[in-house]
């Protein structure tokens, strides 16, 4: 494959691609296994699909997991890689257990309680807490028990519209959520009750995705308004503040954002079919950022998700409405 985008410092090389068959060829979301060698995806069918490399290094489909009555919108691996969660439009979240040494999966639990579509699911850094959010405007926080059962610890209502994304802080028991009400909220357990401790405003429309940096002191958000906003935790005042913004770099909504824990590079995927990379402007200006590479026509239609590999530097995966799952390498000259 020779598809490479270049600039003075970076190349973006397409390593491999896999295609879903029509009519179920809109790939919504993907998640890397913590070992960096397995991908889980979900599309406009009822399946969670597992992808891995064969003995020749070629990526391919190895398993399809069927446990939902409607499309699965988001997938998430537990930090240990043993469990996989899928959030579905059938208002449930499925939990799958991976066998120790094989790519075999067992359906171990189904989390029910939301009254409408579950839009997102996320594990905390310990793998014991799970958060789900829904079109019903609620966030449920679940605790995993020893027998693979889950107990609902809290049901939180604070957003005025559908909740699109939930994301745990990488080092603390702190949950972030974003919504169609144009806000980001932070939730924390205070004396046994999960409460909203901070609300961020700045977006002009629905906020589609969130990502923390490795240390958890910065957050990026993207949305329907084509904005990428950078937030920083102000320790002195104990609140999150907006420190930087990109506007009009995309011609259509930005659906996905991810912050690499290995390189500190940020990547976005947009409905304008592009993938854009950002990094810190300089060590002297830690709160300013710049675009380092823009890949136009990364997919033939909307780019729905972009995720950095957690183990291998500068490797990322993307998926889109064109039915393709692509593996890329951001090469530093």
Curated annotation (Swiss-Prot):
Keywords: Repeat, WD repeat
PROSITE patterns: WD_REPEATS_1, WD_REPEATS_2, WD_REPEATS_REGION
Keyword Repeat belongs to the record: yes
Pfam families, per database record: WD40
Function per UniProt: Essential component of the cytosolic iron-sulfur (Fe/S) protein assembly machinery. Required for the maturation of extramitochondrial Fe/S proteins.
Family: Belongs to the WD repeat CIA1 family.
Name assigned to this protein: Probable cytosolic iron-sulfur protein assembly protein CIAO1 homolog
Lineage of origin: Eukaryota, Amoebozoa, Evosea, Eumycetozoa, Dictyostelia
Gene it is expressed from: ciao1
């Amino acid at each position: 494959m020779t598809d490479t985008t270049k600039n003075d410092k970076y190349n973006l090389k397409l390593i491999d691609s896999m295609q879903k068959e029509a009519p179920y060829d809109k790939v919504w979301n993907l998640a890397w296994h913590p070992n960096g060698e397995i991908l889980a995806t979900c599309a406009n069918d009822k399946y969670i699909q597992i992808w891995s490399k064969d003995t020749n290094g070629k990526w391919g489909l190895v398993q399809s997991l069927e446990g939902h009555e409607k499309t699965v919108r988001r997938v998430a691996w537990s930090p240990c890689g043993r469990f996989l969660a899928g959030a579905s439009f059938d208002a449930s979240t499925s939990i799958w257990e991976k066998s120790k040494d094989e790519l075999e999966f067992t359906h171990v639990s189904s989390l029910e309680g939301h009254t409408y579509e579950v839009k997102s699911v996320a594990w905390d850094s310990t793998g014991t807490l799970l958060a789900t959010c829904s079109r019903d405007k609620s966030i449920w926080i679940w605790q995993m028990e020893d027998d693979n059962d889950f107990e609902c610890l809290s049901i939180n209502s604070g957003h005025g519209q559908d909740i699109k994304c939930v994301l745990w802080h990488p080092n603390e028991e702190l949950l972030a959520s974003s919504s169609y009400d144009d806000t980001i909220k932070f939730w924390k357990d205070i004396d046994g009750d999960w409460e909203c401790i901070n609300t961020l405003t700045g977006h002009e429309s629905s906020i589609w995705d969130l990502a923390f940096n490795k240390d958890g002191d910065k957050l990026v958000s993207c949305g329907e308004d084509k904005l990428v906003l950078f937030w920083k935790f102000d320790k002195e005042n104990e609140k999150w503040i907006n420190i930087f913004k990109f506007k009009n770099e995309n011609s259509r909504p930005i659906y996905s954002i991810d912050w690499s824990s290995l390189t500190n590079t940020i990547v976005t995927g947009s409905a304008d079919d592009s993938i854009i990379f950002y990094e810190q402007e300089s060590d002297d200006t830690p709160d300013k950022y710049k675009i380092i590479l823009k890949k136009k026509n990364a997919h033939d239609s909307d780019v729905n998700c972009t995720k950095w590999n957690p183990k291998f530097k500068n490797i990322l995966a993307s998926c889109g409405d064109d039915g393709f799952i692509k593996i890329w390498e951001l090469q530093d000259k």
